[in-house]
């Protein structure tokens, strides 16, 4: 096992926290060695943040742009780090971004791969032994609430997978060349969100066996035969994708903070 180290021991890097690790493929990483034998340390959050987010525009990747006084990534990490039922937070970063890690004590950091699925696999490998469940979350959803996290964890008590979603309420069209070509029945259709939660062993095996490109981790899970429960989603839990999304996310966060 690689010796624990904090980011402030690395040149040109910021400190994560006294139990933080920089993890790389082939090494085990733990927040605190004593936690490995603690049966209550059972839920981990895996934040996928290795992408470049070009559709959002800007000079830096979207996770590093500031909203409501902090980078997007800081809001997302704090939502999970502050939750009483989350034992570990694993952050998957692009190698070029390691020097930008926020100062959050106990954060476990690993580098990502070429595709999102590669980054998730590397993040799963960095989760400490003994962890029972993992909540996989897009870094670009900084408005996730305690209640959503709680609901996913509660659903995993009886299900192998659980994810938040909102039913589609708008009319749906098909189209080509700027022309409406048909309509789509919206019954039974949902807008998927994250965090998507799973039993750790099951989703790790599912990712190892999956071949191809998946839209999200629910697709990977279902391909492995995992049943995924639908939990109520939240309209405020938007994913920052386009430039206009930054202003909306900032409004949501400032409203919660009483601004």
Name each model-derived stretch.
Residues 40-96:
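N-terminal glycine-rich phosphate-binding loop and ensuing alpha1 helix
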Residues 47, 73, 123, 137-138, ...:
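Residue-level signal for inorganic ion chemistry
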Residues 83, 143-231, 259:
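Conserved core of the sugar-phosphate nucleotidyltransferase
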Residues 97-102:
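Acidic helix N-cap motif at the loop->helix transition within catalytic regions
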Residues 103-133:
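Short phosphate-binding loop-to-helix
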Residues 237-259:
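Hydrophobic helical membrane-anchoring modules
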């Amino acid at each position: 096992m690689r010796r624990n180290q904090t980011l402030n021991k690395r040149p040109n890097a910021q400190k994560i926290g006294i139990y933080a690790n920089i993890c790389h493929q082939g090494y085990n990483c733990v927040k605190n060695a004593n936690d490995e034998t603690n049966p209550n340390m059972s839920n981990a959050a895996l934040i996928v943040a290795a992408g470049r987010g070009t559709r959002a525009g800007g000079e830096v990747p979207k996770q590093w742009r500031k909203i409501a006084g902090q980078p997007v990534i800081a809001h997302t990490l704090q939502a999970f780090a502050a939750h009483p039922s989350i034992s570990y937070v694993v952050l998957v970063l692009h190698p070029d971004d390691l020097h930008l890690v926020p100062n959050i004590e106990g954060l476990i950091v690993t580098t990502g791969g070429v595709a999102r699925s590669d980054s998730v696999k590397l993040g799963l490998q960095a989760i400490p032994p003994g962890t029972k469940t993992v909540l996989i979350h897009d870094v670009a959803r900084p408005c996730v609430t305690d209640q959503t996290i709680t609901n996913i964890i509660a659903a995993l008590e009886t299900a192998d997978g659980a994810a938040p979603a909102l039913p589609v309420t708008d009319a749906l069209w098909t189209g080509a060349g700027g022309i409406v070509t048909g309509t789509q029945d919206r019954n039974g259709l949902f807008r998927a969100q994250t965090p998507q939660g799973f039993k750790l062993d099951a989703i790790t095996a599912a990712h190892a066996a999956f071949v191809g490109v998946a839209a999200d981790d629910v697709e990977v899970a279902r391909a492995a035969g995992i049943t995924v429960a639908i939990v109520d989603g939240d309209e405020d839990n938007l994913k920052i994708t386009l430039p206009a999304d930054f202003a909306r996310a900032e409004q949501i966060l400032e409203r919660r903070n009483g601004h």
